[in-house]
C-alpha cells in the first residue's frame, strides 16, 4: 500500500532580525530556506508534500498542522470554521485577509536557467495552492487537488489504472459517475464490477487478483443507502486495493472518509464547498506520498486543474460551509419527518430517520445525515406534479446550494442509466430528490404539503 506519514510538521513565522541567539532555532530543528526573502522558518523533521521547481513532489510541506500551539496540544483540535477562518496565505507578502486571485497564465522567471516557484498556472498557481492546502487540512489528507469539475477529478483517478485492472464500484451512485464507469473507463481495458456496497458479502465476493480500486458513495445518490467505509477499507487493504469515497453529499463538515480508512476522497466542490451554484469544481484528497505524486502528475499532464478565479470562489464559499451545512441539515431533518408521516408519501430515504436501515452505521462514521433526501409517492403523475408545483424549490440537477432544489433523478441526473438497469437497482421513476437550502423550513414544509395535497389521486 501507499506509505502514510507518522508525524505532522509545523512552520513558524519569525522576525529573524530579533533573534540574537545565533543557532537557537536551528537547534530545535528549524531552518530558513536558502535564498528565501521571507522570514519563514520550516521544520526539517516533518512530512510534507509540495511541488518543487521541476514539478516533482518533495517532502517539505504542512497540510495538517500550522502552528506549534496545535502540535503542543495534540488532543485539541479547533472547529472547522475556526480552521477555515484562520488559515494563512503563506505566499502573500501583504497578508491580505481575503486570499488574492493570481489571475495569470504564466509567471516571470528570475533567469533563463533558474525557475521560480511558479512558471505556468496549469502546473501550479498560488490561489489554487491556497485552496488545495486548506482542503487537505479539512479532509485530514496529505494532499488535495482541485479540478474543473467533480467528473474531471474522478476521471483523473481512473487514469491511475490500466488495461486488465479491475474496479469494484457501487451500483447506486451519481448518474455522471455511472456513465464514466459504464461507458468511458472500459474503453481503456479496465474492467468495472458493479455491486451493492451496503452488502459486505457482495463486496467481498467481487474481489479478484486484478482488483485495484473500490469506488463507493455513502450515503448513495439518490437512494441514500449506507456503506460501511471502515470495513470495506479493511477488506480492500488486506488485498492491496485502494478505496475511493465520493463524499459530495456529506462534505468535509459531516464526514472524513480518510480517517475511516479510505485512500482517496472526492468532493464535487460545486455542491457544499462552493455552496451557491456559481462554481463547477471537483476535489481529490489523498493519503500517502506516492499517491499524491501520481495525482499531481495527472493534474499537471492532463491540464485539468481548477482556474484561479474559480479557486477564489471556492475559498469564499468554504468560509460559510459549516454554517450552511448545519442550517440545511436541521431543516432537512424536519422535512424528512414531515414527509415520513404524509399520507401521499410511500417511503422517505434519509439516514436521519429512525426507520432507516443504515442509520446506526451512518452515525458511527458521520456527524449528521446531511440535507439531501429522496422520497417515493408510488405514482409518476403525482411525483411530477409535486416537482412542478412547488414555489420555493427550483427544478434542477445538483445539490448543496443555499437554494432548495428538487428533481426527478430518472429523468434528470440519472437519465443516462438505461431503464432496465435503473429498474433492476430499484431506482424507480416516481423517485423525487430534494436538496434543502437555507430558506425558512416552515415555508418549505408548507410548500411541499400543498404540492402533495393538490396532486392527482
Swiss-Prot record:
EC category name: lyase
Gene3D superfamilies for the chain: Aspartate Aminotransferase, domain 1, Type I PLP-dependent aspartate aminotransferase-like (Major domain)
Enzyme Commission identifier(s): 4.4.1.13
Transit sequence range: 1-51
Needed co-factor(s): pyridoxal 5'-phosphate
Residue ranges of the TM segments: none
Residues bearing the modification N6-(pyridoxal phosphate)lysine: 271
Notes on temperature effects: Optimum temperature is 50 degrees Celsius.
Any one GO molecular function term: cysteine-S-conjugate beta-lyase activity
Record: residues binding pyridoxal 5'-phosphate: 120, 122, 150-151, 268, 270
Record GO biological process: 'de novo' L-methionine biosynthetic process; transsulfuration
GO cellular component assignments: chloroplast
pH dependence remark: Optimum pH is 8.5.
Subcellular location(s) of the protein: Plastid, Chloroplast
Keywords (A to Z) from UniProt: Amino-acid biosynthesis, Chloroplast, Lyase, Methionine biosynthesis, Plastid, Pyridoxal phosphate, Transit peptide
Xref: Pfam families: Cys_Met_Meta_PP
Keyword Lyase: yes
Catalytic activity: L,L-cystathionine + H2O = L-homocysteine + pyruvate + NH4(+); an S-substituted L-cysteine + H2O = a thiol + pyruvate + NH4(+)
Subunit note: Forms homodimers. May form homotetramers from two homodimers.
Function statement: Catalyzes the degradation of cystathionine.
Similarity field: Belongs to the trans-sulfuration enzymes family.
Name this polypeptide is given: Cystathionine beta-lyase, chloroplastic
Source organism of this protein record: Mimosa pudica (Sensitive plant)
Amino acid at each position: 500500500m501507499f506509505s502514510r506519514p507518522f508525524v505532522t510538521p509545523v512552520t513558524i513565522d519569525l522576525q529573524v532580525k530579533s533573534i540574537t541567539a545565533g543557532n537557537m532555532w536551528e537547534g530545535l530543528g528549524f531552518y530558513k530556506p536558502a535564498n528565501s526573502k521571507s522570514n519563514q522558518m520550516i521544520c526539517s523533521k516533518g512530512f510534507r508534500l509540495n511541488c518543487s521547481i521541476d514539478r516533482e513532489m518533495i517532502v517539505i510541506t504542512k497540510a495538517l498542522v500550522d502552528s506549534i500551539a496545535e502540535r503542543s496540544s495534540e488532543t485539541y483540535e479547533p472547529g472547522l470554521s475556526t480552521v477555515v477562518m484562520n488559515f494563512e496565505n503563506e505566499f502573500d507578502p501583504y497578508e491580505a485577509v481575503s486570499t488574492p486571485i493570481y489571475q495569470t497564465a504564466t509567471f516571470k522567471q528570475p533567469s533563463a536557467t533558474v525557475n521560480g516557484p511558479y512558471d505556468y498556472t496549469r502546473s501550479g498557481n498560488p490561489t489554487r495552492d491556497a485552496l488545495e492546502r486548506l482542503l487537505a487540512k479539512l479532509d485530514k489528507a496529505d494532499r488535495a487537488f482541485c479540478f474543473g469539475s467533480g467528473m474531471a477529478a474522478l476521471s483523473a483517478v481512473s487514469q491511475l489504472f490500466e488495461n486488465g485492472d479491475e474496479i469494484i464500484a457501487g451500483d447506486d451512485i451519481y448518474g455522471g459517475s455511472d456513465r464514466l464507469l459504464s461507458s468511458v473507463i472500459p474503453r481503456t481495458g479496465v474492467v468495472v464490477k458493479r455491486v451493492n456496497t451496503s452488502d459486505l458479502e457482495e463486496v467481498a465476493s467481487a474481489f479478484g487478483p486484478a482488483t485495484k480500486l473500490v469506488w463507493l458513495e455513502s450515503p448513495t445518490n439518490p437512494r441514500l443507502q449506507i456503506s460501511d467505509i471502515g470495513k470495506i477499507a479493511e477488506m480492500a487493504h488486506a488485498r492491496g486495493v485502494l478505496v475511493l469515497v465520493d463524499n459530495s453529499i456529506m462534505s468535509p463538515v459531516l464526514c472524513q472518509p480518510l480517517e475511516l480508512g479510505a485512500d482517496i476522497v472526492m468532493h464535487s466542490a460545486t455542491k457544499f464547498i462552493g455552496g451557491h451554484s456559481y462554481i463547477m469544481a471537483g476535489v481529490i484528497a489523498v493519503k500517502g506520498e506516492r499517491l499524491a505524486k501520481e495525482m499531481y502528475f495527472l493534474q499537471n499532464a492532463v491540464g485539468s486543474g481548477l482556474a484561479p478565479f474559480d479557486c477564489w470562489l471556492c475559498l469564499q464559499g468554504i468560509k460559510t460551509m459549516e454554517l450552511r451545512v448545519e442550517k440545511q441539515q436541521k431543516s432537512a431533518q424536519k422535512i424528512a419527518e414531515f414527509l415520513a408521516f404524509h399520507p401521499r408519501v410511500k417511503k422517505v430515504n434519509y439516514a436521519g430517520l429512525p426507520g432507516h436501515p443504515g442509520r446506526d452505521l451512518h452515525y458511527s462514521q458521520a456527524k449528521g445525515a446531511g440535507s439531501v433526501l429522496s422520497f417515493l409517492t408510488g405514482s409518476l403523475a403525482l411525483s411530477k406534479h409535486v416537482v412542478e408545483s412547488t414555489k420555493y424549490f427550483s427544478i434542477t440537477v445538483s445539490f448543496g446550494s443555499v437554494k432548495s432544489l428538487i428533481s426527478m433523478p430518472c429523468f434528470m441526473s440519472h437519465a443516462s442509466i438505461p431503464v432496465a438497469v435503473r429498474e433492476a437497482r430499484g431506482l424507480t421513476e416516481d423517485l423525487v430528490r430534494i436538496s434543502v437550502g437555507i430558506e425558512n423550513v416552515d415555508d418549505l414544509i408548507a410548500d411541499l404539503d400543498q404540492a402533495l395535497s393538490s396532486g392527482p389521486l
